[in-house]
């Protein structure tokens, strides 16, 4: 099984930029179902290498599986920052790119997408389904440690102080940029499961990626308040197509968020992960989460 890393250029620009970095595995047999993993924040797709690999193996390479990060988080786009709204648009453009350039636009009516969103990637996925269901066919949305409600409340006091002010965002980004590469490498060795993912992530960490990560976090706190009408609309119309996995000790999505969802949608597929799995599950627990996702999708969405 080969994990492919690719730099693509979208057919439509956002702030004049089209560069998008993706990872993917290809199916061994033809299938019209495509699985899209949408990153959280940081929106660096390389963090999801192990998760995509395990998904591919658990599905016996039946489906093309893509991991896509966020525009501006690759560290190669200078002097521009992108909001969470622009990241939603970016994912629409990415799906459009796939249909036109990977699968042939004439066959687009046959292509069906499953979206797997982590953290704010869940919020982005739900918005994409809400806004673009007439353009694309969606079979399911899997919401992993989802932050579609009151994101600001889950931030630590230090992070709140950093992200809410432009001066502190710039200052921290500058500081991170000048940390010696050997220090960054050693930190990544400690937190990432493989040399492959460590090298890929390290190549994208600089002032510009840090500034985009922090700016996007700021716009998340501004945009993500109570569960909004778009999210509720998707929940009400597609509840049996949705899976929600919450963390038991996740400060971004405390127990009250889980309880609220269970109360509002008692028939929903809303569950907890194991107690030791953190919000940033991709660092050390990709296998467990990927196996649960593939199990649920196989039993509920892909059973035919």
UniProtKB/Swiss-Prot annotation:
The active site is at residues 119, 250, 279. This is Lipid droplet-associated hydrolase. Its EC number is 3.1.1.13. It comes from Dictyostelium discoideum (Social amoeba). GO terms for cellular component: lipid droplet. The keyword DNA-binding does not apply. It catalyses: a cholesterol ester + H2O = cholesterol + a fatty acid + H(+). One of its GO terms (biological process) is lipid storage.
